[in-house]
Amino acid sequence: MSKLPRHIGAVLSALRLNGGRAEELGSLDDATWHALLAYTDSTHLTLYLAARARDFAPGWVRQRLAKNLSDNSRRFERIKAAYGEMAYAFRKAGVNHVVLKGFSQWPDYSEDLRLRLQSDIDFYCPPESIFQARDLLIGLGYKEVPTNSFADHLPIMIREGGWQWKGNYYDPDIPPMVELHHRLWNRERLRFGPSSLESFWSRRQVRRVEGIDFPALHWVDNLGFSALQVLRDLVNHGLLLHKVYELARFLDRNVDNKHFWQQWIELHDGPLRQWQAIAFRLAVQYFACDVAPQVADHIKQLPGFIEKWIVHSADSFLNPLENLTKDALWLHLALIDSAREKIAVGLRVLIPMKLQTDPEMVAITDDGTVSQPAFFQRLLRRAAYGTSRLPLHARLLPVTLWHGLRLWWSAREFKAQA
C-alpha cells in the first residue's frame, strides 16, 4: 500500500461516504489547495467535492468552485440540447440505441447531474443501426476523429466550430463529443469477462431525466455495466476515479434495497456478479461505502490473490503520475483462465511491441476544425513517441516482476492461514 500525498489523502477523506472528515480541508495551505484542485479536475471529482466540503475551503477556492459549478451547469444544458437534437434524428430514422453513462447515472450514481463533468454523449447501437447513426450525426455536422483501434466504439465524433481550449475543464462552450459503442465488453482484447451481454439490450427501458425521455439499460444492467467499466479501466491501467466514486454512491444508497439485489442475483449469473464484486471491493477501499449483504457475500468470495492485490496495489492508482506501475497486470492475469492467453497479455504489457499513438496527434485548430497531420508525419511522430517510452517500460519491468512475486507470496500465506 503506497503512501498518498496530503492533497490526495484529504480528497479521499472528504469524500468517504462513511466516516468522512471534510473538516481536514480547512488545514490545507494554498499550495496544497492548488495541487488538490489540479488532482480533482483530472479525476472529475472537483464538483462532487464542492458539494460535500466547500464550507471548509478558503474564499478563493469557494469562488473558483462556484464558477466551475456555474460553467458546468451551462454545459449540462448544452449536453441536453445536443442529445435532444440527436435523439430526434434517431427517432425519425428508426435508429435503435441506448444512452450509456452521462445523465443515465442519475439519481443513484450522481445526486445532481450538474455535479458530474460530462465531456461526451455515449450511445450503444446494435450492428444494424450503428452506421446509420453515424451517418445521421455526420448530417448534423459531426466529424470523426481517429480513435484507438481497440476502442469499444467507432471513431469519436465532434461538431466543428470556433471553440479553443482555454484550460477550463468546465467550459460551457466545449463542443460535446459523441461515442457510438458497438459492444459493451471487449472480451477479445481483455481475454476474460462475459462472452455476450445481449440480454442487456433485450432488457432496455425508457427513462426520464429533467424532461428528457431516453432509452437506457435496465437498472440492474446499468450497475453491471458501470462495474465492468471500472474493472476494464483498472486492468487497462487507466482507472477513472469518478467512476469508482459514483459506484460507491450507488452501493451506499441501495444497502437496504432488497428487491434490487434479488433482481441482481436473478438476472446476472455467478461469474458476472463476481467480476462486478471486484469493482465493488475497490469502491469500499477508496470511499468507505456501505454495501448490501448480498454484495458483502460476493466480496468475501473473491479469491485471496485478488483481495491481496486490492490491499497492496490498488492505492497506487490513486496517484498514477507519481506511482508509475504495471501492477494491474497481476490482477488481469488472475482473471484469465487460459495459460496461453495469460502469456499473451503478460508479454503485451511487459514488453510492448506496438508503438503507442501520440495523444496530441489530433487537434481542434484555431478556426475550430478537426485536424490531424499527414500520413508520413503521423508515422514519424508515432515512432518518436513510442520510442521515447521504451526506457520507461525497461525501468518498470523489474519492479513489476518483484511486485508480482510479492503478491503471489502474500496470497500463498493468506491461503495457508484460511
Regions found by a protein language model. Give the residues of each.
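Conserved NTP-donor binding/palm subdomain of two-metal-ion nucleotidyltransferases/polymerases, i.e.
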Residues: 1-119, 125-418
